[in-house]
Curated annotation (Swiss-Prot):
Name the record gives this protein: NADH-quinone oxidoreductase subunit H 2
Organism placement in taxonomy: Bacteria, Pseudomonadati, Pseudomonadota, Alphaproteobacteria, Hyphomicrobiales
UniProt-listed Enzyme Commission number(s): 7.1.1.-
Alphabetical list of HAMAP family matching this protein: NDH1_NuoH
Membrane spanning residue stretches: 1-21, 77-97, 107-127, 147-167, 179-199, 214-234, 238-258, 262-282, 293-313
Biological function: NDH-1 shuttles electrons from NADH, via FMN and iron-sulfur (Fe-S) centers, to quinones in the respiratory chain. The immediate electron acceptor for the enzyme in this species is believed to be ubiquinone. Couples the redox reaction to proton translocation (for every two electrons transferred, four hydrogen ions are translocated across the cytoplasmic membrane), and thus conserves the redox energy in a proton gradient. This subunit may bind ubiquinone.
Gene behind this protein: nuoH2
Enzyme class: translocase
Catalytic reactions of this protein: a quinone + NADH + 5 H(+)(in) = a quinol + NAD(+) + 4 H(+)(out)
Length: 319
């Protein structure tokens, strides 16, 4: 009983920390975008606008939130929760230090990939429930995009699994004590980065909610806290993909002098900022180009990477 209470307390604390980190990340992103676009960005609420996300949260909480006419109310309300909850659950298996994980399971990587994949259901549910043609188009795009990119997202990580010999996040990190896997798996890292951006629906792969041609895609009819939960899920997904990249390719918590969790946080912050930089600099492709790249280029490359890694692993074990 006491153990359950402790676990529940730690879980609630972790969720609160993640919510604060997601809010802070929105401010960091807006400041960086302002810098790239030669403008100030948020600078009114708090030092350098650092509390702007708090003001935005209050604004969202006080806005009216009701389904549009003709909407499926149950699915309309359920979709935003599906957008944020699986991502929060995914952080439960992320180890930020030696023994610093809410749940250490042998198949942590598979669990995390499954949680990332569930976010596509939120887009489809929200699109269908909204009774809006633009929302429906955005939901169809989200489903097709996730189907295409989830395949080579998993395949791009199988090289790491083959080298480490485990799906456990902690064991994968420990296997990088000699050399980080980004050195051994540069192609896998590049493919994972592309797939991770697509899985999080981030620019330049935000086609399911493309403002230029779909108004706001599957979130067109959402307002208030329902919109906020979709927004929260997107930014948490970026942080989760960044943490996963650090764990699988950049040595996780390994590093000299500083404590492991500090190293993990610094590395994750660098990767997250890199995602913002990609958003600020790269144009959005056409939707057919996005899917063609996934099936005709990325998938064959991920299979090639898997085959070459298998040959090397077998050759090393034989010698």
């Amino acid at each position: 009983m006491i153990g359950m209470i402790i676990t529940a307390t730690i879980s609630v604390a972790l969720i609160m920390v993640l919510l604060v980190l997601a809010g802070t990340f929105t401010w960091v992103e807006r400041r960086l975008l302002g810098f790239v676009q030669e403008r100030y960005g948020p600078n009114r609420v708090g030092p350098f606008g650092s509390l702007q996300w708090v003001a935005d949260t209050v604004k969202i909480l006080t806005k009216e939130d009701r389904p549009p006419p003709g909407a499926d109310k149950l699915l309309y309300i359920l979709a935003p929760a599906v957008a944020a909850t699986p991502v929060l659950a995914g952080f439960g298996v992320v180890a930020i230090g030696d023994g610093w994980a809410l749940s250490s399971v042998d198949v942590g990587l598979l669990f995390l990939l499954g949680m990332l994949g569930l976010t596509a259901y939120a887009a489809v549910l929200g699109a269908w429930a909204s009774n809006n043609r633009f929302s429906l188009l955005g939901g169809m795009r989200a489903a097709a995009q996730m189907l295409a990119y989830e395949v080579f997202l998993g395949l791009s990580l199988m090289g790491v699994v083959m080298i480490a010999g485990s799906f456990s996040m902690a064991e994968i990190v420990e296997a990088q004590r000699g050399v980080w896997f980004v050195v051994l798996q540069p192609l896998g890292m590049a493919l994972f980065t592309i797939a991770g951006i697509a899985a999080a629906h981030r620019l330049p792969f935000d086609l399911p909610e493309s403002e230029n041609d779909l108004i706001a895609g599957f979130i067109t009819e959402y307002t208030g806290m329902s919109f906020g939960l979709f927004f929260l899920g997107e930014y948490l997904a970026v942080l989760l993909v960044s943490a996963l990249a650090v764990t699988l390719f950049f040595g996780g918590w390994l590093g000299p002098w500083l404590p492991g969790p500090v190293w993990f946080g610094l590395k994750t912050a660098v990767i997250a900022v890199a995602f913002v930089w990609i958003r600020a600099t790269l144009p959005r492709p056409r939707y057919d180009q996005l899917l063609s790249f996934a099936w005709k280029v990325a998938l064959p490359l991920s299979l090639l990477n898997l085959m070459l890694t298998g040959i090397v692993v077998v050759a090393r074990s034989a010698s």
